[in-house]
Regions:
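Glycan-recognition and catalytic regions of carbohydrate-active enzymes
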Residues: 289-338
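Aromatic-lined carbohydrate-binding/catalytic grooves of carbohydrate-active enzymes
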Residues: 3-145, 154, 158-159
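Active-site neighborhood of glycoside hydrolase catalytic domains
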Residues: 68-75, 85, 107-275, 279, ...
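Structural signal for hydrophobic packing residues in well-ordered secondary-structure cores
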Residues: 1, 38, 310-314
Length: 338
C-alpha cells in the first residue's frame, strides 16, 4: 500500500451534501464549517468542471476538465487558500478515464472511446457516459494530462479522488487492429498501469483515492498507486458494518475510506443517530459527507468531540493489529466488535 505507514486525515467530501450543486458560496461555507469541527481536509467532488457544458448533472462534461466559470467564477484557488488559512488541506474529484457524449472532448475525438462504430453502444451513468480507450497512446497522454494540468496549475492540491463509474461494457477498440481485439481487457489494464506509473513518477506524494461506483476496483493490484480506496457508496452505517467487516478481512483499515453521512440515509430511508454513524466510520479512515451547517447544536458538539477522539485513537485504528471478536454476520446484523 502506497504510504501505508502514514496516518490519514479526517476529511469532508462535498458529494452527499450538495451533489452536483457546486458553487463558490457552498464550498466556502462547507470549508469553514468543517474547519470549526476540527476537520483536516476539504474535498470538492463531482460538479466543478465544464466550460461549454457545465457539469450540472451526470449527462454532460466528463472529459472537459476545466473549471466551470458559471459555478466557480474565481476558480479553485480561493478554495485552496481558504482551506489552508483554516489549517486544512484541499482535494478534488476527477474521472479521467471517462467521457460524456455531450462534451467538448467527445466532439473533437469520437474515435477515442471504446465502442463498435456499427452498433449503438451501451452507455453508463447519465446514459451518455462512455469509457475512453486507454490502449490508444493519445488517450493515455490525455488521462495523464488531466492530473498533470491540475497539479501544475495547483501544486498545493493534496488529494485527488479518482473515480470510475462505468465498467467495460463496449468491448471494441477503434484503435487496436482486429487481430489484437481479443486481448483488449489485458491491454486496457496494462495501459492503465502505465498511466499510473507515469503519474506516480512525477507526483509520488499526492494522495489519490481510488473510487469505482464505490468499491468496484477494490483489489491488490492498485495498492502501489493509491493511498486509499472508497469502500462503498453505501454510507448507511448499518450496512457499512457488514461491508467493512468483510473488507477488513483483506485490506488494512487505513486504506478503506468510511464517511459519516446525514442522519437520513438516501439509500435506505433510515434515520441513524450521529454517534452510531461516527462509531462505524471510525473503524477505517474517518471522513464526513454532508453539509455541516445542517447539524443541530448537539450534533455539532458531538461531531467535534468525535473528530478529536479519532485523532487520538487513529494510530491504533490505522496502524495497530486488528482482532476480530463478534461478527455482524452471526446473529444481529447491526453489531460487531473489533
Amino acid at each position: 500500500l502506497l504510504h501505508g505507514t502514514k496516518l490519514r486525515e479526517v476529511l469532508l467530501n462535498s458529494w452527499e451534501g450538495v451533489h452536483f450543486d457546486i458553487s463558490e458560496t457552498s464550498m466556502v461555507d462547507m470549508t469553514r464549517d468543517f474547519a470549526a469541527l476540527g476537520g483536516e481536509m476539504f474535498v470538492v467532488d463531482d460538479g466543478w468542471f465544464g466550460d461549454k457544458y457545465p457539469r450540472n448533472g451526470a449527462t454532460t462534461s466528463l472529459g472537459d476538465w476545466m473549471i466551470a466559470p458559471s459555478k466557480l467564477p474565481n476558480g479553485i484557488r480561493p478554495l485552496i487558500n481558504l482551506a489552508h488559512n483554516n489549517g486544512m488541506k484541499f482535494g478534488i474529484w476527477i474521472e479521467p478515464e471517462m467521457v460524456n457524449t455531450t462534451s467538448e472532448l467527445y466532439e473533437k475525438h469520437p474515435d477515442w472511446v471504446l465502442r463498435h462504430p456499427d452498433f449503438e453502444p451501451t452507455y453508463g451513468r447519465g446514459k451518455t457516459q462512455l469509457l475512453l480507450d486507454l490502449t490508444n497512446p493519445k488517450v493515455q497522454d490525455h488521462v495523464f494530462k488531466v492530473v498533470d494540468d491540475l497539479m501544475t496549475q495547483y501544486p498545493d492540491i493534496y488529494y485527488i479522488k479518482w473515480d470510475n463509474n462505468m465498467s467495460m461494457s463496449n468491448t471494441h477498440s477503434q484503435y487496436l487492429p482486429a487481430e489484437l481485439l481479443s486481448n483488449l481487457y489485458v491491454d486496457f489494464t496494462l495501459a492503465l498501469e502505465k498511466i499510473l506509473k507515469r503519474i506516480r513518477a512525477k507526483y509520488p506524494d499526492v494522495v489519490i483515492q481510488l473510487c469505482a461506483s464505490g468499491g468496484g476496483r477494490l483489489n491488490y493490484g492498485f495498492m502501489p498507486y493509491f493511498q486509499e480506496m472508497w469502500t462503498s457508496d453505501q454510507t448507511d452505517a448499518y450496512h457499512r458494518i457488514l461491508i467493512q467487516w468483510g473488507a477488513l478481512n483483506f485490506y488494512p483499515s487505513n486504506m478503506l475510506a468510511a464517511h459519516v453521512g446525514s442522519a437520513y440515509s438516501k439509500y435506505t430511508q433510515r434515520l441513524i443517530p450521529i454517534k452510531f454513524r461516527f462509531d462505524v466510520a471510525s473503524m477505517c479512515r474517518l471522513g464526513m459527507e454532508m453539509v455541516p451547517s445542517k447539524l443541530n447544536d448537539a450534533e455539532r458538539e458531538y461531531a467535534k468531540r468525535a473528530i478529536a477522539e479519532n485523532k487520538n485513537i487513529r494510530p491504533v485504528v490505522q496502524q495497530g493489529e486488528l482482532y476480530r471478536r463478534v461478527s455482524p454476520y452471526e446473529g444481529k446484523k447491526d453489531f460487531s466488535s473489533l
